[in-house]
């Protein structure tokens, strides 16, 4: 049914962007249940502190180790499946800044997973949209590693326009800034 829905949407000029979450799982922290990745190889799939606790840049108790080759392959295979089998037009990545952290949680200059997705032969024409921040304080709006392929989800646009449309006072100036390209966040060049 979903494949048919996407075909019909596309036939009517509507693109389908799939919201994906590759930053955490439902397994929680070290006290959480073992559904899948903890059982496969906890040390590969999750970012762990030297003491064996889970980093929590997602606010959900754990963080996937997205730049490990095994996890990188898993993410790429999942996205390729949705692109080939379902023909989605792109992906919006929840808390995408997590995908730019190394196994110790440090931000990387050229994260392998983000670069791999940007240049993947199957995903090459797909829209890639990053929610360019995470719950650990890494805020990359305006500076997300993109290789001229990644777009950024503008959360301030969402928040300011919502306030404006609700009729909140004092937000007209912010709404104008958002409508005209968020020059306070992005280099106009």
Labelled PLM ranges:
Residues 87, 103-104, 108-189:
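Conserved alpha/beta catalytic core and glycan-binding cleft of carbohydrate-active enzymes
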Residues 1-87, 92-119, 138, 185:
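Substrate-binding/active-site clefts of carbohydrate-active enzymes
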